[in-house]
Design a protein with these regions (language model features):
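Extracellular/periplasmic catalytic domains that process cell-envelope and extracellular macromolecules
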Residues: 24-25, 33, 72-75
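Cap/lid segment of the alpha/beta-hydrolase catalytic domain
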Residues: 1-10
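The feature captures the conserved acid-bearing segment of alpha/beta-hydrolase catalytic domains
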Residues: 57-119
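Catalytic active-site module of serine/aspartate enzymes centered on a nucleophile-bearing elbow/loop
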Residues: 124-126, 130-160
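Conserved acidic catalytic loop of the alpha/beta-hydrolase fold
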Residues: 9-30
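Gly/Ala-rich beta-loop-alpha elbow adjacent to hydrolase catalytic centers
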Residues: 32-41, 45
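Conserved alpha/beta-hydrolase fold motif
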Residues: 31-32, 55
Length: 160
């Protein structure tokens, strides 16, 4: 099996509260989220847009269920969605991915920059749902770093 997605829905309130506390105590920051965590990242960005410089959503499995007008706080936050292999043959992903593409289009319509990377379409193959654990994870991290740099968000480390 190349795609699996565990679901923990009983801790949604605690997770949302933790994201809110993160926004209150720290920031600004770039949110890098995966799967179920992407919904929390977007929800937190809606509540605290001044704290979020960008969102990187790796194989997102959900998004905030809000109207188009409520998406306005996200218009100044660049966003990247990253998709790996083996999605088309999985019943859940064949339903989720079109919904996420529609969500990305709604974000664009409100003025947000949303880049959508289909890794196989970019010539990158062999990824599971856990892209950060795959053999090419370092290459993917470098690609994301370049995307962040293109947004003006990378800070060069101090020379020792």
């Amino acid at each position: 099996m190349k795609q699996a997605m565990p679901r923990w829905t009983s801790n949604d309130a605690a997770t949302a509260a933790a994201y809110g506390e993160l926004a209150r105590l720290h920031g600004p920051f770039v949110l890098v989220a995966h799967s179920q965590g992407c919904n929390f990242a977007w929800t937190m960005a809606l509540a605290h847009p001044q704290q979020v410089r960008a969102i990187v959503a790796i194989e997102p499995s959900g998004f905030p269920q809000v109207g188009d007008a409520a998406l306005a706080p996200l218009r100044s936050i660049p966003q990247l969605m990253v998709w790996g292999d083996h999605l088309d043959g999985h019943p859940l992903w064949s339903q989720l991915r079109p919904r996420l593409r529609a969500f990305a289009q709604r974000l664009r319509q409100c003025g947000a920059r949303v880049d959508d990377w289909d890794l196989p379409g970019l010539g990158v193959y062999g990824n599971s749902h856990m892209l950060m654990m795959d053999d090419n994870s370092e290459d993917l991290a470098l690609r994301i770093d370049r995307w962040l740099a293109d947004q003006g968000l990378m800070v060069q480390p101090a020379q020792s």
